[in-house]
């Protein structure tokens, strides 16, 4: 007598179920990825603005701590083309020494000229209430803090503009260094609508 063959049931997904699941995942990725990337690029740009504010703040504190004028030097990086280096020149020799604090800005958020920023004049009129402003050049500049931590000369507000060269959707950021040494960070979109972040 022959034993009846038992039908073994297969465990798992059918090909149709797998294709439907992959299709749903691809649709979710297509919708979510651009939103995620836009938020990620905006975050990178805001982080670069915070780094600029931090190195300016640190340079100011170095001037107060050492009780002497200290420069924050801004120049294109010699080692990394397309990047900008900012550092607190505590010893005043104009050379970036290994012991001096520095930041390196890249494509995710780098300094740009005032002319490439939309509605920069609207930002200045809103934020400065008639004070004169200076935009240090991304291709080379210094910001001097005196021994009390005030900007020298104390008549202008220094405005640093940042943009993300990878994504224009990230907008722009502006770091405003006031004559007394306080710092404001402003955020602007691609059309030039500005609002204060900090």
What is the meaning of each model-derived region?
Residues 2-7, 13-16, 22, 27, ...:
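N-terminal helix-rich module
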């Amino acid at each position: 007598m022959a034993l009846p063959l038992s039908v073994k049931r297969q465990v798992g997904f059918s090909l149709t179920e797998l294709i439907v699941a992959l299709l749903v995942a691809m649709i979710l990725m297509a919708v979510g990825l651009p939103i995620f990337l836009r938020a990620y690029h905006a975050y990178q740009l805001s982080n670069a603005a915070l780094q600029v504010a931090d190195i300016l703040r640190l340079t100011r504190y170095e001037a107060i701590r050492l009780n002497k004028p200290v420069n924050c030097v801004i120049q294109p990086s010699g080692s990394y083309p397309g990047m900008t280096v900012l550092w607190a020149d505590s010893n005043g020799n104009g050379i970036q020494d290994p012991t001096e604090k520095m930041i390196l800005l890249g494509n995710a958020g780098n300094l740009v000229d005032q002319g490439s920023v939309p509605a920069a004049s609207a930002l200045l009129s809103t934020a400065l209430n008639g004070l004169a402003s200076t935009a240090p050049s991304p291709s080379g500049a210094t910001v001097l803090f005196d021994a009390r931590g005030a900007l020298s000369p104390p008549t202008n507000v220094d405005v640093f503009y940042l943009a993300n060269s990878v994504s224009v959707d990230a907008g722009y950021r502006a770091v405003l260094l006031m004559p007394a040494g306080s710092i404001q960070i402003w955020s602007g979109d691609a059309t030039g609508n500005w609002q204060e972040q900090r």
